[in-house]
Amino acid sequence: MCVIQSAISTAFVDINIKEKLMSYSIPCDKSSFSEIGCNMNGISIVPYIESKINKYQSPNSESLSFQFSGCAMAQYKENGVTYAAHICLYGMGNEGDCREVWNEFIQKREITDVILFYPKTEALQILQSEKCMETGKSPQIITICGYIKGEKCYSAVIDIDEKKVIKEIEQIPLIGVENCIIRETGKKPSSCVIL
């Protein structure tokens, strides 16, 4: 069994994923952050929230998020507490894009142990599109998910109706300062930034 399939089977043993995700479609305040999620059998579920950095505590350093089409996923510690985050990215300079908010957040706060990756890959996006056309299901049902366990990162195309992983890949995350450089200045930030 692949890693994400095992996590989905554990977290959603008796629960419909679609109903759980749709229950998060609630209006949030106008700040750039939200803290919405849940812990399901030891796995933190961090949903996508439009135009937000949605963070949620991840006490076991194991988290799962869905509906990636260009957003980033991160895990970090703040004041000794581990969080997972789904960071909304619409393209630099576009309304609702949270990269500058994230970059400022990690550079001005006491943030450590940052792991950052982009769950969507071109190959997964093509597979997602093919499966949506083949099955007639929407991209909210045949979706790209991200999964972080410890320092390992994974992406997958999954069918949330069937709780089934269609394809999974292990990703190489950006970890710590040595892999994160701001292109314009060449300076190393205090932690991982989104370029």
Which role fits each region the language model picked out?
Residues 187-195:
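Short acidic, low-complexity intrinsically disordered linear motifs used
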